[in-house]
Amino acid sequence: MKVNDRVTVKTDGGPRRPGVVLAVEEFSEGTMYLVSLEDYPLGIWFFNESGHQDGIFVEKTE
């Protein structure tokens, strides 16, 4: 995924929420995405852990 991609994010206890990627930071353990959400327009960071399906919080929408 890259900046300006439309995504959905997994949050605790609710449905996936739509957003837009504002920034991407790569790490050896996975990737951090700064995602703008309706109630967080300046963005909130989410981490996608490499190699663990349960650690995937950001997914690109079609």
UniProtKB/Swiss-Prot annotation:
HAMAP family from the UniProt entry: DsrB
NCBIfam families xrefs: PRK10708.1 (NF007981)
Signal peptide extent: none
InterPro entries reported in the protein's UniProt record: Dextransucrase_DSRB
Entry's family note: Belongs to the DsrB family.
Name under which the protein is recorded: Protein DsrB
A Pfam family that the UniProt record links to this protein: DSRB
Superkingdom of origin: Bacteria
